[in-house]
């Protein structure tokens, strides 16, 4: 069994911390690929910043390390991965997330401990990397990645979300974390992906001026119920423009309020606007 560790370090806000949503998306999709999944074992994701030495030690025999990279965790993630490579040089370290640059000429000179950098949506790419890892570890046919030796063509954006399982409805987010007394969890939530705009001072993300794709109403309503049933206090909506689908997004807002009034959760909903 191939051991997979992962990190998505976050900050604690008022005794709350984000679920490792991005890692859960990847693990959930890999789990649907039966011929691949049976060979890989996902360990708990590292999210807390105060256990770094222990986290490094836990990776001394890991085969693959997935690191979800954002501006707020870049320094600790690179430090962590560098130390893992020192004690476990055979570990394949894969970086992905919004912090990975598209122009990567000097990236591997500065971060030589990284083996593969993933560009864009990671679900299909990670699955393809795992498939190549099982076969011959030749990644030249995996789209959407860079190594120190090559960059492959971009991976096409995912058009059909039906095959992407919910990290909440499958409880994947719970599978990847240790519950800690006194700590509650923040749920990152996507109702769609993409953004039709190209604002000069955008601080949302890199998928601007792209076709928008959305999840089904049924799934989103069930996820809202899951948030309430699991007493999730804070929803961090990752959409670029919540409300752009006016009729549907109003229904989601009404559903959020209904669950709050009935069950007491979620308590806060944060989103982005154009």
Where would I find each of the regions flagged by the language model?
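Short amphipathic alpha-helix
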Residues: 21-28, 223
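Hydrophobic/aromatic residues located in beta-strands of well-ordered beta-sheets
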Residues: 4, 42, 93, 142, ...
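Glycine- and acidic-residue-enriched helix-capping/strand-helix junction motifs
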Residues: 11-23
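A structural signal for short coil/turn segments at secondary-structure junctions
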Residues: 34, 88, 111, 230-231, ...
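Conserved beta-strand positions
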Residues: 6, 67, 95, 119, ...
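Glycine-rich beta-alpha loop elements in corrinoid/cobalamin-binding modules
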Residues: 29, 38-158
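Radical SAM [4Fe-4S] cluster-binding motif and immediate context
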Residues: 167-274
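N-terminal [4Fe-4S]-dependent radical SAM core
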Residues: 5, 142, 147-188
């Amino acid at each position: 069994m191939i051991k997979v560790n992962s990190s998505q370090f976050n900050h604690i806000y008022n005794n709350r911390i984000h679920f490792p949503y991005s890692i859960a998306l990847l693990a959930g999709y890999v789990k649907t690929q039966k011929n691949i999944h049976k060979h890989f074992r996902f360990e708990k994701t590292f999210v807390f910043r105060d256990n770094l030495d222990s986290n490094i030690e836990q990776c001394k025999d890991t085969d693959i390390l997935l690191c979800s990279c954002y501006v707020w965790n870049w320094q600790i993630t690179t430090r962590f991965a560098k130390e893992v490579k020192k004690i476990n040089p055979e570990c394949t370290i894969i970086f992905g997330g919004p912090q990975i640059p598209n122009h990567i000429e000097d990236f591997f000179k500065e971060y030589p401990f990284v083996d593969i950098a993933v560009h864009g949506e990671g679900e299909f790419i990670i699955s393809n990397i795992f498939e190549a890892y099982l076969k011959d570890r030749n990644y030249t046919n995996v789209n959407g990645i860079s190594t120190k030796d090559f960059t492959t063509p971009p991976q096409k954006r995912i058009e059909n979300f039906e095959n992407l399982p919910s990290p909440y409805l499958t409880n994947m987010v719970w599978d990847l974390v240790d519950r800690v007394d006194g700590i509650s969890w923040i749920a990152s939530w996507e109702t769609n992906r993409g953004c039709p705009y190209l604002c000069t001072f955008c601080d949302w993300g890199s998928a601007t001026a792209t076709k928008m794709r959305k999840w089904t109403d049924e799934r989103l309503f069930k996820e809202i119920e899951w948030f309430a049933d699991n007493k999730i206090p804070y929803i961090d909506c990752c959409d670029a423009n919540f409300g752009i689908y006016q009729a549907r997004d109003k229904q989601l807002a009404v559903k959020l309020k209904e669950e709050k009034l009935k069950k007491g959760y979620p308590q806060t909903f944060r989103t982005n606007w154009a």
